[in-house]
């Protein structure tokens, strides 16, 4: 499992590194587009967005809730990490998906990078133990959702632009859709956990298990680095052979988890 975790982590970082030139270019272009918005026909119906004040207000409310809710023990520091990583990765994700497609969205790499940074930062600031682990996984999970939804919204808005839709109405629809689906998905995940439990033979949850192992290992300084490095080198060899690293690594981790549950 630790070999698989090392391979998944390396695969995520490799995909992120390979995407860096496009990430930097798209981030710069996106920022340029924001600041030049006043010059490109703001009054046109097909260029009408939600009021930026409303967007910032909703964002502020969400950040305060995330920082204050006891079930998400991340505090102000965790909220700041989410704002920084979320802003950058949402911009990158939406732009890359809009230009190339969802297959080019390195969500796994972004999630793993956030998870590692968040765990190290929380540990360095004294937030350790179960609280630190839950906080780090919460931050990584939120950023994963941010990157995925940003890419999805980008595809929707791009399609809307092609057919002449109004962005503001689409954005309102996106908000309604996200809230409704979050409630439904949360309820389903709760039922699955109550029925079978994650990490069992029925629901191995390989990626979640890998995230747990990495966070626990960093927090407790108990990572078996020899096995992790074996996984890293396997990922590098697989990349050199031209095989997609992340699908290979996740499949390996899932297989090992399944074998362990059978034994």
Language model: regions and residue ranges:
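Conserved small/polar residues in nucleotide/adenosyl-binding loops
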Residues: 253-263
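Juxtamembrane inter-helical linkers in multi-pass membrane proteins
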Residues: 26-43, 202-209
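Extracellular/periplasmic helix-exit of transmembrane alpha-helices
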Residues: 19, 104-107, 124-134, 184-205
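Membrane-embedded translocation segments of transport machinery
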Residues: 66-154, 162
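Cytosolic juxtamembrane amphipathic/interface segments immediately preceding
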Residues: 34-50, 162, 214
């Amino acid at each position: 499992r630790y070999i698989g975790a090392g391979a998944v982590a390396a695969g995520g970082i490799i995909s992120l590194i390979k995407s860096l030139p496009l990430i930097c270019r798209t981030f710069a272009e996106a920022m340029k587009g924001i600041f030049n918005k006043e010059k490109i026909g703001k009054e046109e119906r097909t260029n009408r967005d939600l009021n930026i004040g409303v967007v910032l207000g909703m964002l502020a409310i969400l950040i305060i809730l995330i920082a204050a809710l006891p079930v998400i023990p991340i505090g102000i520091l965790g909220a700041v990490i989410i704002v920084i990583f979320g802003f950058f990765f949402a911009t990158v994700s939406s732009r890359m998906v809009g230009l190339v497609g969802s297959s080019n969205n390195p969500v796994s790499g972004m999630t793993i990078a956030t998870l590692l940074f968040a765990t190290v930062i929380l540990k360095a600031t004294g937030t350790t133990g179960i609280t630190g682990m839950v906080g780090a996984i919460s931050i990584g999970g939120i950023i994963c959702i941010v990157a995925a939804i940003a890419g999805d919204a980008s595809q929707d808005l791009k399609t809307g632009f092609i057919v002449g839709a109004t962005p503001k109405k689409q954005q309102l629809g996106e908000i309604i859709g996200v809230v409704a689906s979050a409630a439904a998905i949360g309820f389903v995940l709760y039922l699955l956990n109550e029925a079978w439990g994650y990490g069992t033979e029925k629901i191995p949850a390989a990626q979640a298990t890998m995230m747990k192992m990495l966070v626990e290992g960093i927090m407790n300084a108990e990572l078996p680095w020899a096995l992790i490095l074996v996984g890293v080198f396997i990922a590098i060899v697989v990349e050199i052979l031209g095989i997609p690293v992340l699908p290979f690594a996740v499949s390996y981790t899932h297989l090992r988890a399944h074998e362990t549950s059978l034994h």
